[in-house]
């Protein structure tokens, strides 16, 4: 199992998400199931080095992503829970969470999971909004990041090698993902996470 975080969650939502993933990782480890907890954001608010390089090159049209990505491994699959639990404190660190480029983060998480030797692989996405990066969207079509996300989801679901599940917090993720659950209250997250995993394992049996 692998959890993927989203940039926009702040305050209570990100705190609850961190606690839920911490408990889930500990529980799965006791069941001898390996898990990863991953996160993603950008290094800067206004594009960083990517945008500066684009400007120096004369601002060519349709440049694609114009921000520097930051992908974070809070817990790797082979790292024991006790060694990784302190890393989740990074989620609460002021200033670390900025913009969010969902598609490339999902592709990164998928690629990490695809290299694993386990027979059963589940990728869980926790999301609270559509992809947003002002630097990128200001010089590309308005649906650029959303289209990228849809394309990557489509590729993953078509391959059917990894089970992809999305949980939306106040955000309808069913318009992106085939297997999706939307909750309106972040306090429901822990229960929904466990229910989704239980249902998935039950179907396997």
What are the residue ranges of the model-derived segments?
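Short, small-residue-biased leader/transition segments that mark boundaries at the very start
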Residues: 1-5
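Acidic, glycine-rich A-domain
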Residues: 6-205
């Amino acid at each position: 199992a692998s959890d993927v975080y989203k940039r926009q969650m702040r305050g209570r939502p990100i705190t609850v998400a961190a606690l839920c993933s911490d408990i889930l990782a500990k529980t799965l480890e006791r069941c001898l199931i390996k898990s990863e907890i991953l996160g993603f954001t950008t290094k800067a608010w206004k594009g960083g080095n990517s945008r500066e390089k684009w400007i120096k090159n004369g601002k060519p049209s349709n440049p694609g992503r114009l921000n520097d990505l930051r992908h974070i491994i809070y817990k790797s699959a082979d790292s024991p829970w006790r060694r990784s639990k302190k890393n989740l404190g990074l989620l609460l660190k002021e200033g670390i969470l900025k913009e969010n480029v969902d598609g490339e983060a999902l592709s990164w998480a998928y690629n990490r999971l695809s290299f694993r030797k386990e027979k059963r692989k589940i990728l869980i996405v926790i999301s609270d909004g559509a992809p947003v990066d002002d630097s990128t969207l200001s010089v590309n079509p308005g649906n650029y990041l959303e289209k990228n996300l849809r394309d990557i989801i489509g590729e993953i679901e078509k391959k059917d090698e990894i089970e992809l599940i999305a949980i939306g917090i106040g955000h309808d993720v069913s318009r992106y993902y085939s297997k999706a659950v939307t909750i309106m209250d972040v306090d429901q997250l822990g229960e929904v996470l466990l229910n989704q995993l239980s249902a998935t394992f039950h179907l396997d049996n």
